[in-house]
């Protein structure tokens, strides 16, 4: 039985003061015992969040890490070893905003995945299609390519210690959400692609849906057989809304 996971991606939001307020709200949440919960603040606030959530059953992750595992001469980047030292347990890899706006290639994403894993972090591999790709009927082809690039580089066994998040790009920050049936179709295809290489790995890997996840739609999405939780964006900046999504995963 796969344990649900709800992870909040705070993106490029927050000040020292607003993060303190959000931590206070998160500490007051009654969270379901059967769900893993994590938040991913901007790097600047990771230590503040780790300290502020000490003793609360909420993990802390990062939104990005470097292609090299150890610290060194790579100006502006954060090594996964540094993130682990700061108290992070997981890290997003290949988020669509980084692929599309910053030009991260499948090769770079694979390198970041491997570097993170080598430092004991759980990579959360983000895959998903644009609106144009969906309208062209290429959704499954695009997702298979993004997933396959990591399988080809690192082997399917790497996914025994990883999470995959399907995030339809057209639904991120737009208020649009893939229907439960649309999301399930892609999640089933992801699991089938992994199962073609290793059935046990496919059975155990957690697949998250990310794309304007809200409390109102969460329960129906999480009720799908291959959706094991959510990668939550804007809604994770509101403690009460985020808590409601976590409870939906526990139901």
Curated annotation (Swiss-Prot):
PROSITE patterns: TIM_1, TIM_2. Pathway: Carbohydrate biosynthesis; gluconeogenesis; Carbohydrate degradation; glycolysis; D-glyceraldehyde 3-phosphate from glycerone phosphate: step 1/1. One of its GO terms (cellular component) is cytosol. It catalyses: D-glyceraldehyde 3-phosphate = dihydroxyacetone phosphate. Keywords: Cytoplasm, Gluconeogenesis, Glycolysis, Isomerase. It is an enzyme of class 5 (isomerase). It is found in: Cytoplasm. GO terms for molecular function: triose-phosphate isomerase activity. InterPro entries: Aldolase_TIM (IPR013785), TIM_sf (IPR035990), TrioseP_Isoase_bac/euk (IPR022896), Triosephosphate_isomerase (IPR000652), Triosephosphate_isomerase_AS (IPR020861). Its EC number is 5.3.1.1. Belongs to the triosephosphate isomerase family. Homodimer. Involved in the gluconeogenesis. Catalyzes stereospecifically the conversion of dihydroxyacetone phosphate (DHAP) to D-glyceraldehyde-3-phosphate (G3P). This is Triosephosphate isomerase. It comes from Pseudomonas paraeruginosa (strain DSM 24068 / PA7). The lineage of its organism: Bacteria, Pseudomonadati, Pseudomonadota, Gammaproteobacteria, Pseudomonadales. The gene is tpiA.
């Amino acid at each position: 039985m796969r344990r649900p996971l709800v992870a909040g991606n705070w993106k490029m939001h927050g000040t020292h003061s607003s993060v303190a307020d959000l931590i206070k709200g998160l500490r007051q949440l009654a969270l379901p015992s059967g769900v893993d919960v994590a938040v991913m603040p901007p790097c600047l606030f990771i230590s503040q969040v780790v300290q502020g959530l000490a003793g609360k059953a909420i993990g802390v992750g990062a939104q990005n890490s470097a292609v090299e595992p150890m610290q060194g001469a790579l100006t502006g980047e954060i090594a996964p070893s540094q993130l682990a030292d700061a108290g992070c347990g997981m890290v997003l890899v290949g988020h669509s905003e980084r692929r599309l706006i910053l030009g991260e290639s499948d090769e770079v994403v694979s390198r970041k995945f491997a570097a993170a894993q080598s430092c004991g972090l759980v990579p959360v591999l983000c895959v998903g299609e644009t609106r144009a790709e969906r309208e062209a009927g290429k959704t499954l082809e695009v997702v298979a390519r993004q997933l396959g690039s990591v399988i080809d580089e690192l082997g399917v066994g790497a996914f025994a210690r990883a999470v995959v998040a399907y995030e339809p790009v057209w639904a991120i920050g737009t208020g649009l959400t893939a229907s439960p049936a649309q999301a399930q179709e892609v999640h089933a295809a992801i699991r089938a692609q992994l199962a073609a290489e290793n059935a046990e790995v496919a059975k155990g890997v957690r697949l998250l849906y990310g794309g304007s996840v809200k409390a109102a739609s969460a329960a129906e999405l999480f009720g799908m057989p291959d959706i094991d939780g959510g990668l939550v964006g804007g809604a994770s900046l509101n403690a009460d809304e985020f808590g409601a999504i976590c409870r939906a995963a526990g139901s």
